[in-house]
Amino acid sequence: MKINATLTPQKLQKKTARVFELAGEKIRAIDAAWDPARGTPVFTWKGKYTSRGWTEWTQGFQFGLAFLHFDATGEETMLKLGREKTRKYMASHVSHVGVHDHGFNNVSTYGNLRRLILEGKIAREQGELDYTELALKVSGAVQAARYVPTAYRAPWSPVAATPAGTGVAPSGYIYSFNGPQSLFADTIRSMRSLVVAHQLGHVLMGEGDQPINLLHRAVEHAATTARFNVFFGAGRDSYDVRGRVAHESVFNRNDGQFRCPSSQQGYSPFTTWTRGAAWIICGFAEQLEYLDTVKGEDLDAVGGRRAVTDLFLETAQAACDYYIEGYSSKDGVPYWDSMALNSHQLGDITKRNADPFNAHEPVDSSAAAIAAQGFLRLGTYLTAKGETTAGKRYFQAGLTIAQTLFDEPYLSADPRHQGLLLHSVYHRPNGWDHIPAGRKVPCGEACMWGDYHAVELALLIQRLAAGQYYTFF
């Protein structure tokens, strides 16, 4: 990536305003056209949203978009839409025991509504605040209950200089919808559900009325994700490149031993599915921000503040560095996988801008939108800690990506197209994405998580331009 060092949030304000304008049109169009009996809109097919996939994991993005739009513009109809749809459709997601997506669905809806109340953006009604907080407490506990232990109890750290016997034990994880053998990179963003519930004073009650600490479980999951889904250039396997991310880790459930990396949606276990890496970048960066609110003694049982912080920071930086240096195009947008079957046909992608209309492999703008927010948050975090050089590098990388996404050919101004952020990919190996006539790879379509994270990114930049900030907690 060629990072633009001169960009500022203020310089992107015209672009973010355009994002909010177009997002409003798309939100209203989808609400008017979508029949909830069809399930949840997931991605577009020939410009129209359709449902597809395993679970209703994108419904929180659909309604969360309305809250984000209200936050950015003050448009009361969007607040009304978000409130009404959340009350009507989201309760089943709060108690859903079969998914790893509580952060996506519930933090995007109940979490955004609570944040707006606490920020004073809307009138504080205690009943509404209590309702959102109860939903978030239950969501965090239900998500935490989807847990299995590993065989690993010894402390571990990706930081080479860590003294022996210190670190965080990768001793368990929240398993994916593939089953208890499966740990997804994506799930790091659902750790928001656990830590928000913890912040609200909640615990998961287990057998014999034993309380289970939700913060500790979130840290445990994060450590296991870092240990097995992220690579640190330490010779773990023949393809161990620092910052590489495997979408999935597979464990033997009889003994808890790690067996192999895998990939549900990427090209292979030994390349990087770029959206999976984006979840790591964003997820670990925002958890670092949350750690600053936690008392040191509350982390002692999982290795201590220094060990947890070092693990989170090295994981985030490794994934960010590989994004910038390893597989991003010059303009900050990655292809869907770092080295898919036909990637060699593209030449050196790091030396030129991404081409969503190429004939070999699709780009994934949604990966860029997710990662950009992580870059901004990590950059802000490091700068506040006095690490200004690294902080500025990541922060400017985030702005560089945003500048690219918030313009053609990625931002959709076509009123006939229901999507906002074009050229995203859902599941390339399964062939789920639309390939236009005369082309060889998917392009020109949007997805609900891409649209949501584009608006979330624009809102963060809008706040930064005004000298403000926001977090999920």
Specify the residue positions occupied by each region the protein language model found.
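Glycan-recognition and catalytic cores of secretory/periplasmic carbohydrate-active enzymes
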Residues: 1-473
